[in-house]
């Protein structure tokens, strides 16, 4: 039977996250589809993932209203309210299998009034990492890798930013593009539940208040991008 449909607020973009243990010789592949104008789109794959693979995110392609990017699905002039997810498990050894602990979806809701939430005072405990002092070949994704290392090492792990950078690197994309789905999967493979989502200030404050670690990426407005600022 098909997977159950996930009811969601009206949205124009979707991102899938997964956490999985993938021993050598195994991999997982998450897929999603959405309902547009009463019909399900075709399944979109976000690439096979394992820290041991030369992994590649989705190849950018446009099918009708669906624009598939390496780590997200964006609708062009359309919206959706439902999604379906599925995840495939692969192995080269019948005695070894991947294990999946989380499959999640986040959407970019439309026509939502921004919420600020209740202010919070918190002390940030940051690791003394600097992008300029890390491996030069990995610097384009090192900012996100440092964030992941800072969060996980705060809880007792001993993971180098370079290890995260290699585990989440998307070999299909340019080094300037960060694959957030692969980044969440990299944290998950070290035992830290992690997912990527769109959020606002209210969500950020509630996560901090609850004691969770949060990495924030700010999306530039079209006007800011036209002025030369990076998209994220």
Which residues make up each language-model segment?
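Acidic/glycine-enriched edge-of-secondary-structure segments
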Residues: 56-59, 135, 188-193
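Generic structural signal for bulky hydrophobic/aromatic residues embedded
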Residues: 17-19, 88, 146, 154, ...
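Conserved active-site-adjacent core of cysteine acyl-enzyme catalytic domains
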Residues: 163-232
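Non-cytosolic beta-sandwich-type ligand-binding/adhesion modules
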Residues: 1-112
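Active-site-adjacent structural segments surrounding the nucleophilic cysteine of cysteine proteases
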Residues: 90-176, 228
């Amino acid at each position: 039977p098909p997977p159950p449909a996930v009811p969601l607020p009206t949205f124009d973009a979707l991102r899938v996250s997964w956490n999985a243990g993938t021993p050598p010789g195994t991999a997982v592949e998450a897929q999603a589809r959405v309902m547009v104008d009463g019909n399900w789109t075709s399944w979109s794959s976000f690439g096979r993932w394992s820290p041991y693979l030369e992994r590649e995110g989705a190849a950018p392609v446009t099918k009708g209203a669906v624009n598939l990017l390496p780590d997200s699905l964006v609708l062009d002039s359309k919206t959706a309210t439902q999604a379906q997810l599925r995840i495939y498990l692969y192995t080269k050894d019948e005695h070894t299998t991947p294990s999946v602990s989380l499959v999640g979806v986040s959407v970019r809701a439309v026509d939502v009034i921004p919420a600020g939430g209740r202010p919070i005072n918190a002390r940030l405990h940051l690791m003394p990492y600097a992008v300029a002092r890390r491996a030069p070949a990995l610097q384009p994704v090192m900012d996100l890798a440092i964030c992941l290392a800072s969060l996980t090492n705060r809880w007792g792990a001993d993971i180098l930013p370079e290890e995260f950078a290699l585990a989440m690197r998307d070999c299909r994309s340019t080094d300037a593009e960060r694959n957030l789905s692969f980044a969440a999967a990299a944290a998950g493979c070290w035992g830290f539940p992690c997912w990527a989502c769109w959020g606002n200030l209210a969500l950020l404050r509630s996560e901090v208040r609850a004691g969770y670690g949060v990495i924030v990426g700010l999306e530039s407005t079209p006007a800011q991008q036209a002025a030369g600022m990076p998209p994220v």
